[in-house]
Amino acid sequence: MKMTIKRFVLAALLMAASAVSASPVFNMPVVRIQPNGDTLHCFVSGDEFYHRLHDADDYTIVQNPRNGYWVYADTVHTRAGRWQVVPTQYVAGVVNPHTIAGLHPHLGVDRETWLEKQKLFDVPKGNVESPKTSGVNHGNLNNVVIFVRFSDETEITTPFSNINAMFNDSSATSTSMYSYFKKVSYNKINILTHYYPTPSGNTVVSYQDSLPRSYYQPYDSTTNTNGYQTDDERRVREFSLLERAVNYVNANSPVPSTLNIDMDNDGYVDNICFVVKGTYTGWSDLLWPHKWSLWDRQVYINGKRVYTFNLQLEGSGDHYFSSSTFCHEMFHTLGAPDLYRYYVGTNVSGVGSWDLMCSNTTPPQHMSAYT
């Protein structure tokens, strides 16, 4: 389901088309535990195409596959304009990178590698039809949320009331997704969120998958031999997880047939969000918040196809699991593009903090003329 608004056209011309999108994060605090038990406090920055760990001075940190330690990174040039980010011997949090000759801040992948990562999310042409654009941009849109955890995890402990407040709070001072879109649309659109499996009082109830978290993380010969090794394997594992989650809900806690989940009557679920327990990891992988399309299989809720979806991580903290992020992702569903600059080798950020589609603030800021 997409919103057709003429001013979207200009913004769409400013970015490359892609089937996946999300809001970027910058300097989000994370903790990593070294093999010897030491705690490493660092940061993560990036988006679903590419993200990296770094310290407070922006020295990139990677995991050494030989011993599992988080270390400072260097680059190795492979050919003109291309390079690889590689681990060094210098353990992050132990040495001062400023004193090590050859270590430099701001290291990341080269432009071509980034573009290759972006293309991995494109929907292959001819494989599946895309949801048609209806032009409907007002009325009641019912957002479906499905909670997910892995076989080696206990239930989500975030109180349901906290999550519901970010989505549905309608009080006068609320900054929820519902209140945001009601305000910016001048009361033309009401977005209500419904949760499955149905919560038990103030306790979240989630679908528990048959496989552990490590199955959905990258393969590592030392630290994760259970992980995926190719991009196709990653996609199949993610899509299969989401398919099982939908099928579980259909069988055990079904969406009522009276709930209109296809506001524009195009045959597709308007918006579905999978909230997965846990937080993001440091390098690009499956478990990072993103929007994609379930293009390689047909999954249905009450006869409506599940196609475009959002994936959010419940444990990613107030910086990312927030109404601001939900509003950014919902704007994608309504047709808005990302306005932040994906990759140019600089910190230039387009319209910057003036538009929710470029950067996220708390509370979420309004859109600009480009959205």
Task: Write out the residue ranges for each language-model feature.
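N-terminal signal peptide c-region/cleavage motif recognized by signal peptidases
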Residues: 16-19
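Bacterial N-terminal signal peptides that target proteins for export
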Residues: 1-9
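Extracellular hydrolytic enzyme modules, especially secreted metalloproteases
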Residues: 271-273, 277-371
